[in-house]
């Protein structure tokens, strides 16, 4: 079982390989500040080599790895070991991103390995059928995002958000639903949350912004605003 918990609403920031070194840390610090300011949980999907530094420098964000392998302790040159992620300070891992896809059997084994060491799992799905199948594996969160929209600046519409939420919750109401792809600014974030998602997230929208800290603040503020409007 996972040792940690994500509260809704939440927001995911994944700098991928757009940033490295101090730029990753500074983005994480901005996310940490905004998380506390707005009372919104933030998953920071961190390059593996920066996990320890980011985890030690922040207090409010949930530091995730971008990938993990299902190997046990032992052989596995260049693989990412679950126990090593925990030791570095990670609370969870992303899996099955379109840029790092896994076949279903490997994905199931990797989710199981993550659970063994208490890591949360945020698993990407490219279709409703895949989302349904992944939900049955009981990850922490399913990320429903059409791969053709990733990095385009074109976000999903409210119909997709509602369908993804229903798809996941009909299989397991305890699995969280993050709907993303093409999230570029606070308005995109607001539109996604107000349409019914537990969460949304951004990679290039934050990492490539002219003022990254300001964009992170804008996006996380939009999560809070939309969620409060939905529930008041």
What are these regions (language model features)?
Residues 71-72, 78, 139-166, 175, ...:
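Glycine/Thr-rich beta-alpha phosphate-binding loop at enzyme active sites
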Residues 91-102, 141-154, 195-216:
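Glycine-rich phosphate-binding active-site loops on the catalytic face of alpha/beta enzymes
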Residues 110-116, 156-159, 205-232:
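C-terminal helical cap(s) of enzyme catalytic domains, especially alpha/beta-barrels
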Residues 1-80, 121, 131-138:
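Conserved N-terminal beta1-alpha1 strand-loop-helix module at the mouth
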Residues 80, 125-138, 182-200:
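Catalytic cores of alpha/beta
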Residues 66-77, 104-105, 123-128, 176-187:
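Glycine-rich beta-to-alpha transition loops that act as phosphate-gripper elements at the mouths
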Residues 16, 47, 85, 145, ...:
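Conserved, mostly hydrophobic/aromatic
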Residues 59-114:
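Glycine/small-residue-rich loop that forms an oxyanion/phosphate-binding "nest" at active or ligand-binding sites
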């Amino acid at each position: 079982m996972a040792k940690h918990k994500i509260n809704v609403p939440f927001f995911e920031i994944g700098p991928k390989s757009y940033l490295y070194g101090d730029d990753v840390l500074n983005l994480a610090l901005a996310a940490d500040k905004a998380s506390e300011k707005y009372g919104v949980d933030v998953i920071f999907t961190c390059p593996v080599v920066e996990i320890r530094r980011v985890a030690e420098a922040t207090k409010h964000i949930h530091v995730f790895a971008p990938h993990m392998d299902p190997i046990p302790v032992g052989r596995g040159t260049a693989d990412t070991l679950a126990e090593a992620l925990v030791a570095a300070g990670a609370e969870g891992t992303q899996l099955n991103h379109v840029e790092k896809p896994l076949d279903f059997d490997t994905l199931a084994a990797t989710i199981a390995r993550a659970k063994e060491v208490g890591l949360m799992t945020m698993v990407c799905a490219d279709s409703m059928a895949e989302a349904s199948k992944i939900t049955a594996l009981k990850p922490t969160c399913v990320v429903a995002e059409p791969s053709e929209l990733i990095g385009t600046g074109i976000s999903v519409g409210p119909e997709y958000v509602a369908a993804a939420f229903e798809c996941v919750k009909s299989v397991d109401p305890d699995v969280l639903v993050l709907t993303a792809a093409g999230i570029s600014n606070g308005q995109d974030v607001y539109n996604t949350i107000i349409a019914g998602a537990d969460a949304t997230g951004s990679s290039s929208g934050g990492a490539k912004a002219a003022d990254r800290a300001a964009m992170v603040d804008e996006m996380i503020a939009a999560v809070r605003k939309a969620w409060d409007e939905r529930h008041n």
